[in-house]
Structures are given as C-alpha cells and as structure tokens.
Design a protein with these regions (language model features):
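Structural signature of alpha-solenoid helical repeat scaffolds
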Residues: 171, 175, 195-198, 215
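Extracytoplasmic electrostatic interaction patches
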Residues: 86-91, 186-194, 203-210
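N-proximal helix/coil linker or "cap" segments that precede and/or mark the start of modular domains
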Residues: 202-234
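A non-transmembrane, solvent-exposed segment enriched in polar/low-complexity residues
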Residues: 9-158, 162-165
C-alpha cells in the first residue's frame, strides 16, 4: 500500500494540471497546445461542463518528458482567434478563470510563478492597448487638425515609453524567470517594445540568467541561437 501511495504522489509531482472555469463558456470545446520552438503541438481537448474544465498532462507524455523541469508554455484555445497563453512546470497545478468573450483580456491564474507573471504582462498590455485605442479614436476624428494630431502623437510616444519602462523594470525584478522572454518580445500593432538589434544586450542578459537556471530548455537554446545569428550579421 505504501508503495502505491508513493507512486501516486510521485506521478502528481511530475504532471501539470490546468483547471478552471470560463464564464459563459457553456459546453464549448477547449483545446490545449504545448508551444514548442517548432510551433504548436495540440496535446488534449475537452468539452467544458458549464464552463468548467480540467487538463492533466502526464509526465509520460513524450513532449513533456523531454523537457525536464524547465517551464513549458501552453496555449488554451476556445477558437483560433480566442486563446490565452500560460506557463507551467512539472508538479504545478494552475487554476484559471476567464470570460469566454476574450480569454487573454479577462483571465486570472494562480498556482505557478511563471503563470502569474505572464498574467501580469498580459494585464499591463491590455491597459496599454486600451489607452492606445482611445488615442487612435481621437486621432481619427481629427485627421485634418495638425495641432491635435501632433499632440496625440506626443501622448502616444509617452504611452509607449511608459510601457517599455514597465517591461524593463519587470525584467530587472525577475531576472531568473522565463517570463522575461515574454516581456522582451511583447508587441503592439506589430511593433515590438524592444528592438532586437538595439536592445540585444537585454536579451543576452536574459539568456545568461536562463542558461544557469534552465540550461537544457529548448526556449533558452533558441534565444541563444537568435543572439548568435544577430551578432554574426555583417
């Protein structure tokens, strides 16, 4: 009996569990994908039960097994255009709540450090986008007014500068967390807040920290390769 109990406990520690509730999700299908450096690998799906769901990713899953104990990125899809991304390590149990209308803008997560930090980044970006959209609406209504347009452009650049400062502070405050990669690559309207060429030293420092914490992570190896490619350019 003791051996059975220990085996069961060991299995729980090496699995990732993601549970939660999606408001107004009904009985829709929810898909789960592992985000790899080669793209998305769908590993499970379930029908919501009055919005509730549960995924248990076993350590026996080949994609999970080969990733040792480094954080893994997962993406939950209600549809191709409505999803949220999160991170988890083996042994973690994430609890997620969200509204079906927009998973990324409304979700809250607990149970994992990387997951919580990713949510903070998503929430900060949502605030930025909301403010940027307000400025754009005013801009559109005053296309012919050069003075107002110039003022809006100044306010927008202050907004961009402020969010970039937030990301810089985030990276400095969490140097050993994989969520720093998410912060570095955060973007709005196809514009990154960090430029790969001008801010390469930031990515190099993240890589240096991550290499110590998770030397075998495919994400880390890919980021190191990206730096090498940029530095090898003539």
């Amino acid at each position: 009996m003791a051996a059975v109990v220990l085996a069961a406990c060991g299995n729980r520690k090496t699995s990732v569990v993601i549970t939660g509730d999606i408001q107004d999700g009904g009985n829709r299908m929810l898909r789960l994908a592992l985000v790899t450096t080669d793209g998305l690998s769908y590993i499970d799906s379930t029908n919501l039960k009055n919005g509730h769901f549960e995924f248990k990713i076993s350590s026996d899953n080949e994609l999970v097994k080969e990733r040792e104990n480094a954080p893994m990125m997962f993406q939950l899809f209600l549809s191709d255009n409505n999803s949220l991304a999160t991170m988890a390590k083996k042994g973690e149990k994430l609890k997620i709540t969200a509204a079906a209308e927009d998973l990324t803008k409304t979700y809250h997560v607990s149970g994992g450090e990387e997951a919580v930090l990713m949510q903070q980044l998503d929430s900060a970006l949502t605030v930025f986008v909301t403010e940027a959209n307000k400025l754009y609406e005013v801009y559109q209504k005053n296309v012919g007014n050069d003075s107002i347009r110039a003022d809006i452009e100044v306010h927008y650049m202050k907004l961009v500068t402020g969010h970039r400062k937030y990301l810089e502070d985030f990276i400095a405050a969490h140097p050993d967390n994989m969520a720093c990669y998410i912060a570095f690559y955060q973007s709005y309207n196809r514009r990154n807040f960090f430029d790969l060429n001008n801010d390469l030293d930031v990515l190099k420092q993240i890589n240096a920290n991550m290499s110590k914490a998770y030397p075998e992570s495919e994400y880390v190896k890919t980021m190191i390769h990206i730096v090498e490619m940029v530095e090898s350019r003539p």
